[in-house]
Amino acid sequence: TGSRFDASLEEIFHLITDTGYEGVYPSVFGEFPGSELANLMDNARGGHFSNEGTITEDGYRYASAVPSSYPSGAWYTYDDETCTYDCMNTEYIYWAMTSILGAQEEYCSEIRHEWKLCTKEKVMNQDPAIYNLLTNPEYKLPSSLPDGSYGR
């Protein structure tokens, strides 16, 4: 822990999301338009923004089309033009889960340009559907942050 954020948490979480949750529960955690996760993400972004005409080499993932500006009510406003639609989903689940687990509280001002719900309470109140999905015991998602004391 400490004041420095461990970036490996984000990268490991992305791998688990991309190859684990999506593979086991595609209709729920699929990173494509129409999955439960994607519908929740589109709501958090204030709409569905993607370039439907561009299909990546895997055949179903659509290239992202970040809007020139997000709607004023959006709380997920990731603006990396290189992030495809599936990538946007991965980032959304990362931001929501790490906020629920308490990893983002001290970074609220630093991440506000991408994610406005930096605490568990903010996720519960403003995006209750993603909170309910990520805390549903059926999916056995993390319930605490790693603390580096494995096997001790």
What function would you assign to each model-found segment?
Residues 1-58:
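Acidic/His-rich structured neighborhood in mature extracellular/periplasmic domains
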Residues 1-4, 82-89, 122, 126:
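Extracytoplasmic/periplasmic, Sec-exported soluble proteins
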Residues 48-109:
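Extended, compositionally biased non-globular segments
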Residues 90-152:
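Pan-zinc metallopeptidase signature
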